[in-house]
A protein has these predicted regions:
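Entry/capping segment at the start of metal-dependent catalytic domains
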Residues: 2-87
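Metal-dependent phosphoesterase core characteristic of DEDDh/y 3'-5' exonuclease domains
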Residues: 53, 78-278
Length: 278
């Protein structure tokens, strides 16, 4: 099933100067205007190559051990560069609303490739260096983002469904932002308690990477899975958080329709690829 879209959504670039105004738009969309699905993608950089807690291959680890690796990296070595957020509605004709939040971490850090677990040899260019329009843009302060995140209506909202692709690090970063960058919880059970508090519990979370593993024919990264379903990237570029969150949202819609009819995806809710499955 290929998606047929007659419009190209605007990916709203968000910096310190327009952060508050864009969160007001998010709050408006969530409160009585039909938007109830949130798709998130994060792009981040590896600040310290030695931040992993051990050298055991993830396939040989328990979920608790995998979580400790994620915690060690997110608390000790990864800097968030961008957060992409797409709001979608089940009502026909409602356009997707897409934001790309630009943070100040990792301007010259090496990006981590989660598919190979290796440091990529060349740093990806920072958007403000690619385009003169961004040269004077001030990156977002994480504390200000966290404060507005709490006021927006995204957190502790049990009417919202959260969608990710390879969710372990995305959710870990979101939880840090929700707790004003406090260290992640020490255990996996405490981590899930935080997820329940801020994101409505496991039944509200779907990991597209895990869902693809539950089919007989979908595998690989986001681009490969989306192409297998006939879903095209209609705005932005790969590895830019806003574009990836939008593509993840469209791919989720298509996958649910094609592979999980009659609400069969519900049985797979709350399973985080990278922690419970790999």
């Amino acid at each position: 099933m290929a998606t047929a879209l007659c419009y190209v959504p605007l990916i709203q670039s968000v910096w310190a100067s327009n952060l508050e105004a864009e969160f007001e738009r998010i709050s408006w969309a969530l409160h009585g205007h039909g938007y109830s699905r949130v798709t998130v993608d994060t792009e981040f950089y590896l600040a310290r190559p030695d931040c992993s807690s051990n050298n055991i291959h993830p396939h040989c680890q328990s979920p608790e051990q995998r979580y400790k690796d994620v915690r060690a990296r997110v608390d000790g070595g990864l800097g968030i560069r961008q957060l992409g957020l797409t709001l979608s509605s089940d009502h026909p004709g409602y356009p997707d609303l897409v934001w790309e939040f630009n943070f100040g971490c990792g301007l010259h850090r090496l990006p981590l490739d989660l598919e190979t677990d290796n440091i990529q040899p060349k740093p990806q260019p920072w958007p403000r260096h690619q385009d003169p329009r961004y040269s004077n843009m001030e990156p977002i302060n994480s504390y200000n983002f966290s404060k507005l995140l709490h006021y927006s209506g995204l957190l502790c909202n049990f009417d919202v469904t959260w969608v990710f692709f390879h969710s372990a690090y995305d959710i870990a970063f979101l939880l840090k932002l929700a707790t004003f960058y406090r260290p992640l919880p020490p255990s996996l059970s405490d981590f899930y308690s935080g997820i329940t508090t801020f994101f409505g519990g496991s039944h509200c979370i779907f990991d597209l990477k895990y869902l693809s593993c539950c089919t007989n024919h979908l595998y690989g990264g986001l681009d490969h899975v989306s192409k297998s379903l006939g879903v095209e990237r209609i705005a932005g570029e790969a590895h830019q958080a806003g574009s990836d969150s939008l593509l993840t949202s469209h791919t989720y819609e298509c996958m649910i329709y094609a592979c999980f009819p009659f609400d069969r995806a519900a049985r797979h809710a709350g399973i985080l690829y990278g922690i419970h499955h790999i």
